[in-house]
Structures are given as structure tokens and as C-alpha cells.
From Swiss-Prot:
Gene Ontology cellular component terms for the protein in this record: cytoplasm; cytosol; endoplasmic reticulum; nucleus; ribonucleoprotein complex
Originating species: Xenopus laevis
Biased composition (Low complexity): 161-177, 399-411
Region (Disordered): 161-206, 392-415
Domain free text: The third and fourth KH domains are involved in RNA binding and self-association. Stable self-association requires RNA.
Localization, UniProt: Nucleus; Cytoplasm; Endoplasmic reticulum
Protein name from the UniProt record: Insulin-like growth factor 2 mRNA-binding protein 3-A
Keywords annotated in UniProt: Cytoplasm, Developmental protein, DNA-binding, Endoplasmic reticulum, mRNA transport, Nucleus, Repeat, RNA-binding, Transcription, Transcription regulation, Translation regulation, Transport
Name of the coding gene: igf2bp3-a
Length: 594
């Protein structure tokens, strides 16, 4: 994506004019400017410089009386499903952007691009060409919080004609696009890379992300990069110092890719370098260790009533604080964990903190691998559940045996059945879920592809309200996930408290015994597998549809897994009934159950 199209050119513009413009703007280019009637093409050294040219010149520079437009040059055959959206308000919530994009079709992937501009840039992959075309037409020039969006095609490698054998190899890659929110990434591997689908990927590592005061960045890099090279060699790590991010900011992020031991060793060396530089420059303020962690993992790091964090503080003799949820924006899905103490205790605290974060990540990967098998085709990375600094969720087949290999999926082309789930939320949270004039619940419904209704309160003193969600499994996953997230964002659960909600699903009364199992065996296995509390209340009177309630209580992943496993049991019961009916109709004797 380093080839540029320069449009809206005057007839008088020459290659020399464009060369001078790029040189004045300090944007390097390779080769010659190919000037046609009213437009031109040129190559930049890499994608970063191409983005810089677009940010600096497009719509901002006049040449021979005309304001030029600069965008990625995309061959017609590759103008398919991928768009780049620029000039997004920097403090826009993901939820708003998601709902806007979803109005024009199914979004498979949405990833932020690092730029030096104040506004945000994302690359979006729609499910098909028509959705992308509508998105381009409707969103280009769209006014969002006084910012005018700029939308262009970017090359879709998967649109390039291929041999049938190549297409077969690459289909799994399409189903598992790279991580959705690419904060701090240098860009994912191309989805069309030869052999990418056939070659197994290594287990994804969780890098260590630090914040360091800007004045110490030079000392960490060293003369001509000597110090940083020495650190990487000593610790067998790859270290990225994001100097261009947040120009003028007092702190800069550093990403360390290595084994847990390598990350910790590099972190300790960096702390020692900063301390020495502070002494040499008579810098008297305390320099705490600041670790960046994706918000999804912070609740588990803190633990119930803050127990995990208190234990780390006591064991390492440090003082640890975590930035508030309100600081999270489109640019920043990470919380800052500040550790105060001398170098040795801080280094020990880093090890314990990252150990907890890695455990949470691995647990989520395991849970989501199971989820991916239970909801075929579900694009988990598109929901933003994983930290951007990792490469997203690996395909379920990589290194993890399918725990549900016997699951029967709907026939090809058949839509998954709609389900109804009752989710109970704090009564005080109803306003936040509905939003001003119902805007939030409408956006959520569109994004998830589900019907979402709030049931009337059971009484004036009711502490809980029931949210009725109707839709297929993927819609349930999206809608429930967003509701869990909204409750945490709006502080209906404390900063040291994990969001656990009660969910009710109805099952036919004749199938309740299958959910419970002999002597409660099935329900106990369900609870062990999912970490959710699953209860089928005894002595229930079936409703008018001959159904009874199964109650599930747990955090989001636990609840989702329990719901999927119960639906799987119900599907098995239905299949057996259908088989028995066919057998009865054909007059054949029924096979004896073992």
C-alpha cells in the first residue's frame, strides 16, 4: 500500500512540480512521478510514508489553483471489500464507529492504523464488495462530531484472481482475519501471503508494554542506537520505541516482544538506564514503572475486592495504582498500571503483573477457541476482545484440539436458528443501555443483528431488569458482550469487581433432564468446563409452551460457553427426536439406547 494516486491536478502540473512539493513536505518517493491528464501516480518507500503523504497533502495543498487529493492507488480488480477511513474524531468511542460501519453491511475486520495526525485512521474489511461500495458512497464526506470522514479503497489481496488450489488454501485465512484494533502494531501479515494458511503459526506471545518519560528515550536508544541494540542482544528481545506516537506527549510507549523472562530482563535494564540518566541530569522526581495493559485483563489482575493487587503489593513491597476507565478512548484501549518502589521490587512486581495478564490472555484464548468451534464462522477478532499489542486470536485449529469435534453444524447455506436469552442487569443501568432517545439500544441492535428489548420492571423496588435478546448465536455473543462492557464502562460495577450477570434461557421440559444429567453429572461438568454457575431450579412448573428456565451466572466468557453447550445439548435432543419420528413413520424398530 505504498503506491499513491494524486488526483484533482491542474493540466499545467508537471512531474517537477510534484517532486518539489514532496521534497518541501519532506516526504521521500521512489522512481518518477507518472503524470496523466488530471492525475498522477508515485511510489513511496513504505506504507508509513504513504500514510504521511496522505495526511500531509490530501485536501490541504493547492497546486496551480487546485486543491490536490492524495490516496492509495488501488487497481480496479482489488477495489473489493477493503476501505480506509480517515479523519475520525480522536475521542470517538468504538461503539459509535462500529454501529456506523455496521449500517452498510457486515464488518469482518476493523483495525486502527498508526499515523502522526491528531485524528484516527482505520482499515475496514466488509463481508462483500457491495457492502464496501455502499460504505464508501455513504461515509465519504460524512460529518461526525464536526469532522468530515475521508473514505478510499485500499488493496484487497483476496480479490486478485487466483488458481482454485490457492483459493482453497486461503479460505481459512479469510475466516480468521488479524486482530481488530491494531494499536501500536506495525501492520498484520498480508492475508493473501502464499502458504500462510498451510504453515502453522507459533503460539501468540503477550508483549510487555511500558510508558517512559520522553526525556529518557534518547538514553534508552543510545548513540546511534547502540544501547537499545545491546538490550535486545542481552535479553533476546525485539524492542519498539514508538517515538512518533502522540507528538509532544510527556511519555512514550515501548513494546518489548520476547519470552516472559526476556521481557522482564529488558524492563529492568530500561529502569536502570532511566535511573542513571535521572542522576546524571539532576532529575529529582520519582520515576515509577508504568505498564500498559488491555482493559479486558485489568479486572482479573485486580481480583475480587482487590485481593490480587494487594497480594502483589505486599509480596513485592510496592505501591500499585491503575488509571480510571474514563481514560479509555478510540486511541487508547489500555489502562496504565503505575508501580512505585525501588528497581528490584518494581521488577518483581512487573513479573507478577505480567504473569496475571498472560494467564488471563491464555484463558481467554482457550475459551474463545471453544467459542469459535461452537459458533462456526464467528469472527471473534472483529469484536475487539483481545489486546492490540498481540496479533489477535489464533485460528482454533492451531495447537488446540477441538473440544467439540462432535458438534453438528447447520448444513451449508442454512442460517443458524434464532435464540431468545433473558439477561438481568441492574435496574439503575437501564438508562445507560437505552441511551438518549433510545439511540444506544438502536445502535447496539443494528451492530449485533439482534432484537433487544427491556422488559417492564416487576415492581417499584425491583433491583434488576430483564433484557430480552433475540437472535442467532453470533448476534447473542455481540449483544451480550456489549452490554457487559457498557455496565463496566459506566461504573455499575466497581473498578475492582468483575462483571457477573444472571442469564435465563428456556428449554423444553422434556430436555431439562438431559441438561442436568444422571445425578447432576452433566450440569456439574458444564460448571467445571465453563466456570459459570448453572442451575435448573427444581419443581418448576412448565410454562404455556411446556418450557422451563435454566439459570446461568458468570462473567461474559463463562456465560457464553455455558449457553453454547446447553444449546448443543438441545440440538442433540431435537435430532434424536427427529430420528425417532422418522423411524416410527417408516415402521422400523427403534434402536435400543445404551
Amino acid at each position: 500500500m505504498n503506491k499513491l494516486y494524486i488526483g484533482n491536478l491542474s493540466e499545467n502540473v508537471s512531474p517537477t512540480d510534484l517532486e518539489s512539493l514532496f521534497k518541501e513536505s519532506k516526504i521521500p518517493f521512489t522512481g518518477q512521478f507518472l503524470v496523466k491528464s488530471g492525475y498522477a501516480f508515485v511510489d513511496c518507500p513504505d506504507e508509513t510514508w504513504a500514510m504521511k503523504a496522505i495526511d500531509t497533502l490530501s485536501g490541504k495543498v493547492e497546486l496551480h489553483g487546485k486543491v490536490i487529493e492524495v490516496e492509495h492507488s488501488v487497481p480496479k480488480r482489488q477495489r473489493s471489500r477493503k476501505l480506509q477511513i480517515r479523519n475520525i474524531p480522536p475521542h470517538l468511542q468504538w461503539e459509535v464507529l462500529d454501529s456506523l460501519l455496521a449500517q452498510y453491511g457486515t464488518v469482518e475486520n476493523c483495525e486502527q492504523v498508526n499515523t502522526e495526525s491528531e485524528t484516527a485512521v482505520v482499515n475496514v474489511t466488509y463481508a462483500n464488495k457491495e457492502h464496501a461500495r455502499q460504505g464508501l458512497e455513504k461515509l465519504n464526506g460524512y460529518q461526525l462530531e464536526n469532522y468530515s470522514l475521508k473514505v478510499t479503497y485500499i488493496p484487497d489481496e483476496m480479490a486478485t484472481p487466483q488458481a482454485p488450489s490457492q483459493q482453497l488454501q486461503q479460505q481459512p485465512q479469510q475466516q480468521h482475519p488479524q486482530g481488530r484494533r491494531g494499536f501500536g502494531q506495525r501492520g498484520p501479515a498480508r492475508q493473501g501471503s502464499p502458504g500462510a494458511a498451510a504453515r502453522p503459526k507459533p503460539q501468540t506471545e503477550v508483549p510487555l508494554r511500558m510508558l517512559v518519560p520522553t526525556q529518557f528515550v534518547g538514553a534508552i536508544i543510545g548513540k546511534e542506537g547502540a544501547t537499545i541494540r545491546n538490550i535486545t542482544k542481552q535479553t533476546q528481545s525485539k524492542i519498539d520505541i514508538h517515538r512518533k506516537e502522540n507528538a509532544g506527549a510527556a511519555e512514550k510507549p515501548i513494546t518489548i516482544h520476547s519470552t516472559p523472562e526476556g521481557c522482564s530482563a529488558a524492563c529492568k535494564i530500561i529502569m536502570e538506564i532511566m535511573q542513571k540518566e535521572a542522576q546524571d541530569t539532576k532529575f529529582t522526581e520519582e520515576i515509577p514503572l508504568k505498564i500498559l495493559a488491555h482493559n479486558n485483563f485489568v479486572g482479573r489482575l485486580i481480583g475480587k475486592e482487590g485481593r490480587n493487587l494487594k497480594k502483589i503489593e505486599q509480596d513485592t513491597d510496592t505501591k500499585i495504582t491503575i488509571s480510571p476507565l474514563q481514560d479509555l478512548t478510540l486511541y487508547n484501549p489500555e489502562r496504565t498500571i503505575t508501580v512505585k518502589g525501588s528497581i528490584e521490587p518494581c521488577a518483581k512486581a512487573e513479573e507478577e503483573i505480567m504473569k496475571k495478564i498472560r494467564e488471563s490472555y491464555e484463558n481467554d484464548i482457550a475459551a474463545m477457541n471453544l467459542q469459535a468451534h461452537l459458533i462456526p464462522g464467528l469472527n471473534l477478532n472483529a469484536l475487539g476482545l483481545f489486546p492490540s499489542s498481540s496479533s489477535g486470536m489464533p485460528p482454533p485449529s492451531v495447537g488446540v484440539p477441538s473440544p467439540t469435534s462432535s458438534t453438528s453444524y447447520p448444513p451449508f447455506g442454512q442460517q443458524p436458528e434464532s435464540e431468545t436469552v433473558h439477561l438481568f442487569i441492574p435496574a439503575l443501568a437501564v438508562g445507560a443501555i437505552i441511551g438518549k432517545q433510545g439511540q444506544h439500544i438502536k445502535q447496539l441492535s443494528r451492530f449485533a443483528g439482534a432484537s433487544i428489548k427491556i422488559a417492564p420492571a416487576e415492581g417499584p423496588d425491583a433491583k434488576l431488569r430483564m433484557v430480552i435478546i433475540t437472535g442467532p448465536p453470533e448476534a447473542q455473543f455481540k449483544a451480550q458482550g456489549r452490554i457487559y462492557g457498557k455496565l463496566k464502562e459506566e461504573n455499575f460495577f466497581g473498578p475492582k469487581e468483575e462483571v457477573k450477570l444472571e442469564t435465563h434461557i428456556k428449554v423444553p421440559s422434556y430436555a431439562a433432564g438431559r441438561v442436568i444429567g444422571k445425578g447432576g453429572k452433566t450440569v456439574n461438568e458444564l460448571q467445571n468446563l465453563t466456570s459459570a454457575e448453572v442451575v435448573v431450579p427444581r419443581d418448576q412448573t412448565p410454562d404455556e409452551n411446556d418450557e422451563v428456565v435454566v439459570k446461568i451466572t458468570g462473567h461474559f466468557y463463562a456465560s457464553q460457553l455455558a449457553q453454547r453447550k446447553i444449546q448443543e445439548i438441545l440440538a442433540q435432543v431435537r435430532r434424536q427426536q427427529q430420528q425417532q419420528q422418522k423411524t416410527v413413520q417408516s415402521g422400523q424398530p427403534q434402536p435400543r439406547r445404551k
